[in-house]
Amino acid sequence: MGCCQSSFLKPSSLHDKKITSDDLSGRRGKGAKRGNRHRHANINEGRGWHFSDVPDFSEFSASVLRDATNNFNKNAVVSVCSDQEPNLVYQGCIRSDKDKRLIAVKKFSKTTWPDPKQFATEARAIGSLRHVRLVNLIGYCCEGDERLLVSEYMPNESLTKHLFHWEKQTMEWAMRLRVALYVAEALEYCRQSGLKLYHDLNTCRVLFDENGSPRLSCFGWMKNSKDGKNFSTNLAYTPPEYLRSGTLIPESVVFSFGTFLLDLLSGKHIPPSHAVGTIQKQNLNVLMDSHLEGNYPEEDAAMVFDLASKCLHNNPNERPEIGDIISVITTLQQKLDVPSYTMLGISKLEKLEMEHPKSLIYDACHQMDLAALHQILEAMEYKEDEVTCELSFQQWAQQIKDVCNTRQQGDSAFRNKHFESAIDKYTQFIEIGIMISPTVYARRSMCYLFCDQPDAALRDAMQAQCVYSDWPTAFYLQAVALSKLNMVEDSATMLKEALILEDKRGS
């Protein structure tokens, strides 16, 4: 995917209606049909199944959002990017008779926004925006002391995770260029729509949708400010003119974009003070991310470096306009037909997966977080064995006692993360054959994953399924093992089946 030219959407006036618990029983969000097109892009890539189904901007009641986030449960927190104000973002799910929609809810403090009318006015202005490059704002709440914003939910984490804290693979050069282009397009669209000041542009503000396409968070426009005097800007990302006068101007956004480009080049966050010094020394080789060595055109990197240096010019009048930045970055785009999720090394999420609220075990498997998966399996104990445990030869009490002791020894090793020892004890338990336990197979599968034996892990997960045919955990473990075996499509299919089974159990 990619685009050579951009045609930006003009903002539409959206109706503002308060959503209460009663409304959800019969209300389904109506899609806003808008003519956003990129002439040289695959229109499905980056847009997602839900772009045409973005609901109209609405005012939500506090009770609806509390229900959606399980009373703002700490386990629902999906973002804790630091700021000078509370900056917690929660994942939530709004349910009606016919619909389920995942949302993100940002919680502000009343002290930051003492005037609810000003909060509502700012939120409505941002809520009028609709664009494929944005994480669109779909509602707000300023009931009582609450100051809440509601946006689309992006399931594939932030640029901070993919650029700075990656596990499997570094972000390739072509994807970094795509991120730069899409963010610039989002900024230009909003500039043309009258919102010219984006605050604290950084990698935390860029999120990836179900297609793996980068989008700019709408929360960056929501600041308690007047005439450019912003009261809560993070000084780590601010331009020199703000430090001098306390005022932001449209050119300040270009400066922030320059620091953003340096992050993409280097693979690490460079504070603006260091960034300017690096630019002045013209030391591109030192700046470049060493993980990209030999995997990028040096001339293209030099052009991005030069563009960043112009964005970081001390004189705001000497900085390029966002439209000019787009023109330069567009010429550098590569792999136009390769989907973003492929370049990120993740699986594409389908509509089914986006509609269903995710469990902790789903998130752990989707993110290949073995440590979290281990904690979940340990917490499950043997609750699922009640319907499948076969106590053959119950008269052999001593044998039963012995086999239970063996299992307990395996459990102790599993709990203490002595996975090879746990494998030995669980194997003894299975070979005795007096008790049949899907949980033991699941735990041994988990141990094999930690010991880098995905084939054995897959066999045990399949055996757990044979014992307990509709147990979601068995499917989740198969998904992880298949991913470890680089069977990406099979893993995605298995993850989807696990999600369906889990949803059936919860309904």
From Swiss-Prot:
Residues 16-26 have a biased composition (Basic and acidic residues). PROSITE patterns: PROTEIN_KINASE_DOM. Its EC number is 2.7.11.1. It catalyses: L-seryl-[protein] + ATP = O-phospho-L-seryl-[protein] + ADP + H(+); L-threonyl-[protein] + ATP = O-phospho-L-threonyl-[protein] + ADP + H(+). This is Serine/threonine-protein kinase BSK11. Its main location: membrane. Probable serine/threonine kinase that acts as a positive regulator of brassinosteroid (BR) signaling downstream of the receptor kinase BRI1. InterPro entries: BSK, Kinase-like_dom_sf, Prot_kinase_dom, Ser-Thr/Tyr_kinase_cat_dom, TPR-like_helical_dom_sf. It holds the Pfam family PK_Tyr_Ser-Thr. Phosphorylated by BRI1, ASK7/BIN2 and ASK9/BIL2. GO terms for cellular component: plasma membrane. It comes from Arabidopsis thaliana (Mouse-ear cress). Transmembrane segments: none annotated.
